Amino acid sequence: EMIFLFAEWVFREGYRRFEWKCDALNRPSRRAAERFGFSYEGIFRQATVVKGRNRDTAWFAMVDGDWPCLSAAWDAWLAPENFEADGRQRQALGALTAPCRAAGDPGL
């Protein structure tokens, strides 16, 4: 829910982009970015040096034009009827945000 609330604030305040950057080797972070609705924008090769190794950075972003679709997807996911009595989700967040994303990460 925190990502949803943060994105809601970002776009309500008039920002045009909300970015997610991570080590390109961090597949869980890349999967999370897509699940939350960030669109894959590419890899910045040798973006920085971390602990003596070149680190490629994977870039993802939501833009203000994406937000109406993503907000509706999050609302549907957070709706009480999307959850079973034991708390299990009926529809996965990633499935709901997928149609809103401009591009998927080919590395996943």
Stretch-by-stretch model annotation:
Residues E1-L108:
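Acyl-donor (CoA/ACP) binding surface of acyl/acetyltransferases
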